[in-house]
Amino acid sequence: MTIYEKNIQTLSKYYPGMDYNIDKAKHDLKENYTIIEEKSKDGMPVLKVKKDGHCCYLGGKRNAQKPTEEWLKAQGDLCDGYTYIMLGIGNIGYLRELIEHVDFRLNIIIYEPSIQIFLKSLEWIDLEKGMKKHLIIFWVEGIGLMTLDRIGSVLDKVMRLENLNKVQLFILPNYDILFEKKCESLVKKCEDTAFENRVNYNTAVKFSNIDSINVMKNAKYLCTAYKTIQLYKTIPFDTTGIVVAAGPS
């Protein structure tokens, strides 16, 4: 079994139906660029993308491994629940560093705009260990119902206000050039999510005292309110009554 086949099985285990959605996406593929696999001078696989007459490398042609190692060292002290929102998986070295060298359980959300790049990356890394160790979500444009417009539900869960100081958005090299609009859109979605959570928190704090005061002021009406007294004496005190009601009242 190849690494690619093993990864498809692993993904299907955690996300049922992923294998079917990947096969369908491959069949319906309509991407207007070419993916070329090369080797860097240090022997690591590197992707070159040809798009609109231009070529971009997603990893270093001379030394592909060292930049990812230095990146991990620069991350400092991580902790359980730290979240990476990554744009791209074209340089698999960044994900590999997190899987192999971070023992804390991380949340790793990877948005990949290209099906071709995603499928090629599945040939280079065994995901089984990483999926057991961390929460890894692949959000690949065009596979199943996954689109950038629908990633908000994922961002809402990992970008709660109490976790914002443990969230990092990381855009892999040259993705801002190859997928400029997707990059700008993801950045804006993250900013909007963080802002909305902050506003909701501030609103809750500001009105928490007012809510308490309102409850105390209106407590005296509970005993005489219509909904409180409408069943009074309707059911005899010495009889068991069953009230069937719909709604919070």
Model-based region annotation:
Residues M1-I242, P248-S249:
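N-terminal donor/sugar-recognition subdomains of glycan-related enzymes
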